[in-house]
Amino acid sequence: MNKGLIGKKLGMTQIFAEDGRRIAVTVVEAGPCVVVQKKSVAKDGYSAIQVGFGAKDASRANAAQVGHCKGAGAGVFTHYRELRMDNTDAYKLGDVIEAAVFEEGDLVDVTGTSIGKGFAGVIKRWGFKGGRSSHGSRFHRAPGSIGCSATPSRVFKNKKMPGQLGNEKVTVQRLKVVRVDAADNLILLGGAIPGSANGVVLIKDSVKAKK
């Protein structure tokens, strides 16, 4: 069965393994999430469940949001994500999914929004080498030529140029679940995940995990 949770990144710390190795981990408050919708192949063309995370005051939600969550009977939520799975029979509306759904040693993919760093040049954004620093080059951090002249008379798509750095959807794959604290709904993941503290992330079974 496919597993997944919406969570909140709390920050990074370190723990020690039994053999004395120091492991850098990210602490994620994973769930509890509530199943608010089920999708089927017959009706929607694919099989999935939609889960909600983070309670929201119903007075601050519009009628569409309240009506959407009415079937689950668990109030309104701040964040919603879809989790595709082969079979949704194990879930029904209103079911609560908690951190205990994952076990130590599981491999997961984590999707979040990277930290926005504003407008950046090509050296910081793309790792360009830059030009000479001396001898009158007058070409230090500039991008250089961005294309030809008469032919093709345009700049090609996806040309690496200055612009917004960060603040985009990023997925980190094959992170190991180092520890699960079911009582407090905490999951410790080996390594770093996208985003800043208190950022919302989606944790799912790794698509590249060995079967």
From Swiss-Prot:
Any one GO MF annotation of this record: rRNA binding
Gene Ontology cellular-component terms for this entry are: cytosolic large ribosomal subunit
Q: Does the keyword Secreted apply?
A: no
Show the Pfam families listed in the entry.
Ribosomal_L3 (PF00297)
Q: Which SUPFAM superfamilies does the annotation name?
A: Translation proteins (SSF50447)
Keywords of the record: Ribonucleoprotein, Ribosomal protein, RNA-binding, rRNA-binding
Q: Name one GO biological process term.
A: translation
| Subunit structure of this chain's protein | Part of the 50S ribosomal subunit. Forms a cluster with proteins L14 and L19.
Which family does the UniProt entry place this protein in? Answer: Belongs to the universal ribosomal protein uL3 family.
| Record function comment | One of the primary rRNA binding proteins, it binds directly near the 3'-end of the 23S rRNA, where it nucleates assembly of the 50S subunit.
What name does UniProt use for this protein? Large ribosomal subunit protein uL3
Taxonomic source organism: Citrifermentans bemidjiense (strain ATCC BAA-1014 / DSM 16622 / JCM 12645 / Bem)
